[in-house]
Each structure stands twice: as C-alpha cells, then as structure tokens.
C-alpha cells in the first residue's frame, strides 16, 4: 500500500473528515528527546472491564467501560491481570495487545480468547463485563495455565467452579466468534488523510469492505475503487484481504509493503491500521454523522454517499450503472440552498455517468431533497426521484 490511504487534505480540507492534523499520526513539531511521551493502548481489541495493568516505568491502572485504554511510556513492558490472575507474561507495551503478544503458542492464544469470552456476564452488550461474583472467585485462584491442550484447560477452569456450569467455546469456534464481534464493532464508514489524497472505507458486519481513493495518478496508483474481504485474524490482529475488484493500483489495502500482512485494531475511537513492511501506522476516524444531510447514506451496501460538514462529498460506487458507467468513485463539492443540493465542482470521477456527475457531458446534479427519519429522498431536475437510507 502506498502511503495514500486516506482522507482529506486536498485544498486544506481536513475539516471535511471531522478531524484534524493530529489524526494523521505525524507530528511536525516533535517534543524534545528528553520529554516523557505517554502513549495509550488497548487490550485484545475489546473493552474488557476490570483488567489491571502495571508497566515497567511504574504506571498502573484498571481498564473500565469509561476508560478502555492503558497508559505506557515508550520502551515500557506491561503486565496484565484480572483479580490477581496473571494474563501472560511481561510484554512490550504497544497500541494494541493481541493474544499473540501474550503467548507464543497458538493453543494458549485460543484458550485465552475462550476464557475472556466466558467471563462476560452480559454478552448482549458491547465489550466484556466481568461480574463482581467472578472477580471474587478469581481472587481465590492462584494461577491459570493457558498453555495446555483445550480439553485440559477446560477441565482446569471447570474444577475452579469459576463459571458454574458454563462451557467454554471451542478453539475453532472462538476464532469465528471473535471475528464476528470485531467486524460488528468496526462496521461503518471511516476516513483518514495522508498528503494530498482522500479516501473513504466502508466496512460491513461480515468483514467485506469498499474503499474509494481520490488522489493524483502516479506510476503505481490512481483514483479508483477497491472491494474485498478483510479476513482478519483475532489471534494476532493481522489480515490479508481477499480483493474482488481493484482499480486504484497500489493504493488501498491490496499491496502490503514487503508482503508483510497488515494488522488492524480499534480502541473505540480510531481504527488503527499498521503496515509492518513500511513501519507505518494510520489512524482512521469515523465519518461524522448528523441528523441532517451530513453523514453516510446508502443506496446499497456497495453504493454510498458521504456528505462532509464543509460541503464536500464522496461517492463510493462498487457496482456502476446498468446503461453506462462502471464501479468507481466521485469526489467533489456541493452547496445547499432551501433544501436544494447543487454539485458545484467535481474533483475526481472514475465511474462515468453514475453519481452526481456525468463525465460524458460534464453535467452536474441539481436536486431537491428531503429527510424523513432515516430516509433521504432526492429529486434531480429532469430525472426520477431516488431514496437513500442512512448508514452508520
């Protein structure tokens, strides 16, 4: 992936993403080398309440529903525990701790996920809520051996009477379950920014995604669309996407540097993409939503409009038109006057006649619109009305 994944710096348009320069992960004025930098990380890509941590620099605390991240200084090691029961050993502190960071053995990694899953006292809510009853029981358990066959691990947990009659989810099933939970958590529309490029990615609850890239053409990449499936691995946060359509060259998620898989995690605010081959980290933010036009609207799961709050829009078209056009993107400016939407400038258009602009005659849409609940109805001049549904 070239370092063009992602959103609005064109013409100084960072506010279109509802973000700021700080979201790019770069710092034009780094602090002095002797200044202590405090970082924040997440534990297992989930909001797990009552996980305690202590770092080698002396920082300690407990993760809660309100405070989902742990603090650490660069170069720190960190130890995690729940009611005194250690979870793995002392590991390098970083922006996300995966099972593979805590245990080298895959069996132990899966056992850990099954264990954390079983501790959840309210599976119907987001995150993992550990009841006071279980926390008290854990205080009487000196240690738990994760590095053992699942059958033995399950027996050990059963003998502690920690979970009463609850059965642990099997190793294969827990991987699928954690994938589903993660996809649900990150589903929606995200953006970031890098140099003079703009891109938007919409992720579905099954892990499929559509990514649009608007950037100047170079020898390796160009504006275009990418569709695929993340294929995320909950054991180490890595993913090697299956690409089904790609017109943006090396931009997007299709070309990981040095063929080293990406990793993907979330802290509840940012979607954090790391590219090991380039030693680069990108933090994406959700597209701002509102009760008005600003936000994401869908015609289908792979045809979506994102309207930003400074009068820019982005159209993701993963299908194309029946009579003209093909899958692609459209990015431009719009104005609103008395419930009339007018496209004023088109900066990129790779899907020909679909969307708000027709490249064959440079015609731009001028349409009245109305919003009712979660529906947006547009009536372009001289055309039939069409309705979009609000997306997250």
Language model features with spans:
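Sec-dependent signal peptide recognition
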Residues: 2-8
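Acidic/polar residues in short coil/turn loops that connect beta-strands
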Residues: 57, 204-206, 267, 308-310, ...
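C-terminal motif of bacterial Sec signal peptides marking the signal peptidase cleavage site
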Residues: 15-16
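Feature for extracytoplasmic/surface-facing segments of secreted or surface-associated proteins
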Residues: 20-191, 233-235, 263, 267, ...
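Short, solvent-exposed mixed-charge patches
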Residues: 390-392
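Contiguous, well-ordered beta-strand patches that form the walls/edges
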Residues: 194-198, 213-278, 300-303, 317-386
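Structural signal for glycine-centered tight turns and loop->strand junctions in beta-sheet-rich domains
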Residues: 76, 205-209, 236-237, 268, ...
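A glycine-anchored, Pro-Gly-centered beta-turn/N-cap motif
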Residues: 188-189, 295-296, 332
């Amino acid at each position: 992936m070239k370092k063009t994944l992602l959103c609005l710096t064109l013409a100084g348009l960072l506010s279109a993403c509802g973000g700021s320069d700080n979201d790019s992960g770069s710092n034009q004025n780094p602090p002095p080398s002797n200044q202590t930098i405090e970082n924040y990380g997440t534990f297992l890509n989930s909001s797990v309440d009552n996980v305690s941590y202590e770092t080698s620099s002396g920082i300690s605390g407990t993760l809660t529903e309100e405070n989902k991240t742990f603090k650490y200084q660069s170069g720190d090691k960190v130890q995690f525990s729940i009611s005194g029961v250690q979870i793995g050993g002392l590991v390098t502190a970083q922006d996300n701790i995966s099972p593979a960071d805590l245990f080298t053995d895959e069996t132990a990694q899966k056992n850990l996920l099954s264990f954390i899953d079983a501790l959840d006292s309210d599976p119907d809510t987001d995150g993992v809520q550990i009841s006071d009853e279980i926390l008290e029981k854990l205080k009487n358990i000196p240690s738990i051996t994760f590095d053992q066959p699942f059958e033995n691990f399950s027996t050990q947990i059963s003998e502690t009477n920690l979970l009463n009659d609850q059965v642990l989810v099997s190793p294969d099933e827990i991987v699928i379950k954690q994938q589903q939970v993660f996809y649900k958590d990150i589903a929606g529309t995200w953006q970031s920014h890098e140099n003079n490029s703009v891109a938007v990615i919409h992720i579905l609850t099954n892990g499929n995604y559509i990514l649009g890239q608007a950037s100047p053409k170079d020898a390796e990449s160009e504006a275009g669309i990418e569709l695929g499936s993340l294929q995320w691995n909950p054991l180490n946060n890595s993913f090697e996407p299956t690409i089904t359509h790609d017109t943006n060259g090396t931009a997007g998620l299709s070309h990981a540097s040095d063929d080293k898989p990406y990793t993907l995690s979330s802290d509840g605010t940012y979607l954090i993409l790391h590219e090991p081959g380039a030693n680069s980290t990108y933090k994406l933010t959700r597209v701002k939503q509102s009760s008005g036009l600003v936000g994401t609207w869908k015609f289908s799961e792979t045809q979506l409009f994102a309207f930003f709050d400074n009068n820019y829009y982005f159209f993701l078209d993963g299908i194309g038109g029946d009579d003209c056009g093909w899958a692609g993107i459209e990015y431009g400016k719009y104005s609103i006057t008395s419930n009339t939407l007018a496209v004023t400038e088109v900066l990129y258009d790779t899907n020909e006649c679909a969307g708000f602009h027709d490249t064959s005659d440079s015609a731009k849409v001028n349409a009245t619109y109305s919003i009712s609940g979660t529906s947006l109805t547009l009536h372009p001049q001289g055309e039939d009305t069409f309705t979009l549904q609000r997306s997250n």
